[in-house]
Amino acid sequence: MEIIISNWWVIILVIVSLIFVKNFSKKSKVDIKKLIKEGAVIVDVRTEAEYNSGHIEKSINVPLGDLTYRIGEFNKEDKIITVCAAGIRAESAKKYFNSKGYNATNGGKWSNIKDII
């Protein structure tokens, strides 16, 4: 009981985080589905080997390390969805795209997006 009392803020933080993640996931799936219907470009930032082991049909493989010199391949008017194995590299790619004036969204795990399509 003493541990719970002394760490009450950690418990509250975990609960709030779980609520946020649950709500974010629901919202993002709807948004991603809409973006795909609108013709968004899906950019898979996993390595070539990861991509070759399974990927979303019509997605473009640009490993995260190559993005800085391949970004010119994309049109700034296109909506972009970044994906990877867990969502972490996709977030980095999204931030990079957006910092260069593109309209990018982190799609998270490629396998989750594949299930929505």
Question: What residue spans do the PLM features occupy?
Answer:
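Rhodanese-like catalytic fold shared by cysteine-dependent sulfurtransferases
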Residues: E2-D31, E38, E48-K79, I88-I117
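Short hydrophobic beta-strand that contains or immediately precedes a catalytic carboxylate
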Residues: V41-V45
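Short, surface-exposed ligand- or partner-binding patches at beta-edge/loop junctions that are enriched
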Residues: V83
